[in-house]
């Protein structure tokens, strides 16, 4: 991609459609709104509300898209940061415990506390035009800058996930590292080194659940390898230690496969391979993506 980054092709269609739907459906509110008279609405920013049932059915990450877009329209110059910027792009991330919308001003100055919009936090990070983009009028840091900000904020798991997403979208480890190394903003030397080195330590995994599992285990110093051949017959996307295969959203009996055309024999062979691997000492742990994302510490402790 060179030095001139093209961001339009990276916009996630689902996030874009949700953002545009919010702008069509939003209802303007004010301090004078009498909420008991509109019990079907929920406030998503100082000046905006949406249908309560619809919003609560979105799930936390999609709520981040709506809340970030709403808060951005209320804040005239502010730029979304961190997980709230990642949500607008459809990047891979895990939601933080603090759900306040994260912002920065282009100057890097912090606004007076009495001027802060509700449920927002500002970082003293400069956000020059070269580090930002607009998605349907919502000001966000671009994906490379979002990755560096995760490193600045010591959110290493989300930094790893951002790398995985960038690799999947055609960036190289060299491009990510070079951007971090030449980043002009203020950043602690150790975190700059981390941002420059980390792209070479993150494997290329095609899906968010496996990338999340690898990031959590690697961050916990668990010896985990990817794309491993098991004694010439089996295969593991993730192998912890020497014998523990991590499987996510997989059916151990391959029942769904049997319903497909010509799937009966293939399902039989998959089950036979499972038994072959078990007979040679390979253990398997099955998780769903929702289990890992909902209880990451529990996932790591079960593997350890």
Annotated model-derived regions:
Residues 9-13, 20-26, 167-304:
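Surface segments flanking catalytic/ligand-binding clefts of nucleic-acid enzymes
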Residues 1-187:
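Short gly/ser-rich loop at a beta-strand->alpha-helix junction or flexible surface loop bordering the NTP-binding
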């Amino acid at each position: 991609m060179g030095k001139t980054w093209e961001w339009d092709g990276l916009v996630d269609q689902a996030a874009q459609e949700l953002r545009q739907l919010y702008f069509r459906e939003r209802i303007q509110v004010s301090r004078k709104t009498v909420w008991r008279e509109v019990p079907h609405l929920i406030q998503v920013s100082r000046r905006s509300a949406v249908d309560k049932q619809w919003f609560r059915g979105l799930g936390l990450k999609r709520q981040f898209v709506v809340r970030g877009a709403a808060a951005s329209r209320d804040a005239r110059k502010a730029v979304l940061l961190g997980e709230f910027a990642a949500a607008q792009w459809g990047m891979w991330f895990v939601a933080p415990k603090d759900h306040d919308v994260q912002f920065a001003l282009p100057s890097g100055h912090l606004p007076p506390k009495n001027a802060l919009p509700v449920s927002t936090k500002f970082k003293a990070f400069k956000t020059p035009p070269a580090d930002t983009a607009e998605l349907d009028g919502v000001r966000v840091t671009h994906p490379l800058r979002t990755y560096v900000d995760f490193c600045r904020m010591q959110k290493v798991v989300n930094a790893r996930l951002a790398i995985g997403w960038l690799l999947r979208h055609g960036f190289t480890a060299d491009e990510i590292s070079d951007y971090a190394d030449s980043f002009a903003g203020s950043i602690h030397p150790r975190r700059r080194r981390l941002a420059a080195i980390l792209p070479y330590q993150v494997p290329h995994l095609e899906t968010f659940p496996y990338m999340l599992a690898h990031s959590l285990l690697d961050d916990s110093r668990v010896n985990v390898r990817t794309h491993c051949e098991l004694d010439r017959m089996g295969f593991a996307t993730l192998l912890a230690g020497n014998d523990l295969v991590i499987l996510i959203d997989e059916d151990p009996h391959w029942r769904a496969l049997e319903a497909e055309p010509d799937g009966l024999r293939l399902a039989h062979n998959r089950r036979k391979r499972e038994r072959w691997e078990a007979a040679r000492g390979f253990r398997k742990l099955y998780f769903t993506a929702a289990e890992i994302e909902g209880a990451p510490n529990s996932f790591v402790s079960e593997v350890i």
